[in-house]
């Protein structure tokens, strides 16, 4: 069992039955944690693996710029999506794509202000989401330059 699988199983058990938990696919927590680990490799930080019964309040990382980051990971990462009814808590939103190899690849990112202005759509689960197509995201190299410049 990998560290991701171990912590994903613990998170799934911790959040089972919670109103805010939306496991829309098999291995939902594993997919999300894989994206967080990949972003952690990108920025030189470990994901926060502490048990948080109330969730992470929409913030996965605080990078050296003191900007907060929320990583959104999907198997089919056509769009960066964020549930429209939830507050946009992070400064930066990153899209990661989870592959058949159980690894995640970082796709791109946007500022909170851009996501706040994004169109809203229900992608078939009865939940309205703000979304930005992956082609419209900023390149990860740009975010990397911003992070590393301030270290």
What is the predicted function of each stretch?
Residues 1-65, 71-151:
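Nucleic-acid endonuclease domains
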């Amino acid at each position: 069992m990998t560290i991701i699988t171990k912590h994903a199983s613990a998170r799934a058990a911790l959040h089972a039955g919670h109103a805010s938990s939306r496991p829309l696919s098999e291995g939902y927590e594993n997919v999300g944690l894989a994206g967080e680990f990949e972003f952690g490799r990108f920025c030189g930080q470990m994901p926060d693996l502490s048990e948080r019964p109330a969730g992470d309040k929409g913030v996965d990382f605080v990078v050296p710029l003191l900007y907060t980051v929320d990583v959104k990971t999907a198997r089919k990462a056509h769009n960066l999506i964020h549930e429209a009814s939830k507050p946009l808590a992070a400064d930066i939103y990153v899209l990661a794509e989870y592959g058949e190899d159980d690894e995640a690849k970082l796709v791109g990112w946007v500022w909170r202000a851009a996501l706040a202005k994004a169109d809203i759509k229900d992608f078939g689960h009865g939940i309205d989401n703000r979304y930005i197509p992956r082609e419209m995201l900023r390149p990860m190299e740009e975010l990397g330059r911003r992070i590393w410049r301030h270290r």
